[in-house]
């Protein structure tokens, strides 16, 4: 089945591409060096995993997806390439926020105007139904830039961004496959394979990070899949298994809830404290879980399972309609955050800060390296 072929191609390309990327990054001393106050790793780690993810994704899509099944393919690849190049340059030498946001807005306009993939209907949320063209473009651009940055900001501990990305892409692969949109299902499963291949090296002990070149692209593909799903479910009947999707906005919010809620939360707190919303701190959800003494793996698992439970809730409560379901999801997220805040206030522990050294100081082998060793032995 082509779906399986695309998945395995993406996965294997990443698995075999990352070791030489790590070797080159170590040789050229291209590392992720966090600020002193925010160190949570034992060593400086290469952050070019996005190179393997994006390359495998593009290769699999270009090789296996006919243009007839995905008419937007060239525009999607072009827009994704903008973010990949900007992210890669930022990973290597750093870029000003103005340049990064400029690239993100250019990327969003390509999707909203040239590709004509737009959020067109809010289904009564805030009293808004079908929007005119200009309002639709404006909202779409804001949402794209917001979600792209949300995934960029959630990429703070081992495995988190990639695990959430797997959950997002698998959900949409299933939905598009059921809806008969095979090209979009192929695109989503290509991303799934690339991310799982990357996770072999990103689960603790992480050997590589995806970097901005990976997280920006991940956020971009996730939000494009979301917008396409909204358009599709507005135009035709779609089911999640046997459950008819009648509250599509609620389902999309549930799929993206952890990165979106976390970003809105930290931005709000920073502004309430009279700081720039773009000032880096250690107040993200994953940092808060680490402060309870949880490991990276435990924190990643909790957040990914929580996000998945929101999706299950959204699917189960489709009968509520968009306005009520969106309100319930937001209320649940706020209450959960409040309970976490109370729990942290009682059981907080200091986050252990490990010494950062140049190069791979920790000798444990990642799962991906163990797999490659087994293959070479055979």
Predicted region positions:
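Alpha-helical transmembrane segments
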Residues: 1-29, 54-70, 74-81, 161-292, ...
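Membrane-embedded alpha-helical core segments of multi-pass
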Residues: 81-82, 86, 103, 107-118, ...
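Transmembrane alpha-helix boundary signature
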Residues: 59-71, 89-95, 112-126, 232-236
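A generic, lipid-embedded transmembrane alpha helix
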Residues: 45-62, 109-114
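Membrane-interfacial loop-to-helix junctions in multi-pass transporters
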Residues: 131-142, 185, 247
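Juxtamembrane helix-capping/reentrant segments at transmembrane boundaries
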Residues: 34-48
């Amino acid at each position: 089945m082509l779906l399986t072929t695309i998945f395995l191609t993406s996965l294997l390309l990443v698995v075999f591409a990352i070791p030489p990327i790590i070797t080159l990054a170590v040789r050229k001393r291209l590392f992720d060096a966090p600020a002193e106050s925010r160190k949570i790793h034992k060593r400086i780690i290469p952050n070019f995993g996005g190179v393997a993810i994006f390359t495998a994704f593009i290769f699999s899509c270009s090789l296996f997806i006919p243009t007839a099944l995905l008419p937007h393919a060239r525009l999607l690849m072009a827009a994704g390439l903008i973010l990949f190049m900007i992210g890669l340059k930022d990973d290597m030498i750093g870029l000003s926020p103005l340049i990064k946001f400029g690239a993100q807005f250019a990327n969003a306009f390509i999707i909203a105007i040239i590709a004509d993939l737009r959020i067109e209907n809010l289904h009564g949320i805030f009293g808004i139904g079908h929007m005119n063209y200009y309002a639709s473009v404006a909202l779409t651009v804001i949402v794209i830039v917001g979600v792209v940055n949300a995934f960029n900001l959630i990429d703070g501990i081992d495995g988190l961004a990639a695990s959430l990305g797997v959950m997002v892409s698998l959900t949409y692969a299933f939905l598009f496959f059921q809806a008969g949109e095979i090209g979009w299902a192929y695109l989503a499963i290509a991303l799934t394979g690339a991310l799982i291949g990357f996770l072999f090296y990103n689960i603790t002990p992480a050997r590589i990070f995806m970097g901005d070149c990976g997280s920006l692209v991940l956020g971009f593909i996730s939000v494009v899949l979301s917008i396409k799903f909204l358009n599709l479910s507005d135009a035709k009947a779609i089911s999640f298994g046997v459950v008819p999707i009648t509250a599509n906005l609620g389902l999309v919010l549930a799929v993206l809830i952890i990165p979106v809620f976390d970003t809105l939360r930290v931005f709000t707190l920073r502004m309430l404290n009279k700081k720039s919303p773009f000032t880096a701190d250690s107040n993200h959800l994953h940092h808060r879980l680490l402060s309870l003494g949880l490991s990276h793996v435990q924190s990643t698992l909790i957040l990914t399972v929580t996000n998945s439970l929101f999706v299950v809730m959204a699917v189960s409560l489709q009968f509520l309609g968009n306005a009520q379901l969106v309100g319930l999801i937001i209320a649940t997220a706020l209450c959960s955050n409040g309970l976490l805040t109370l729990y942290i206030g009682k059981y907080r522990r200091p986050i252990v800060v490990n010494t950062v050294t140049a190069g791979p100081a920790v000798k444990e082998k990642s799962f991906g390296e163990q797999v490659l060793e087994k293959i070479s032995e055979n």
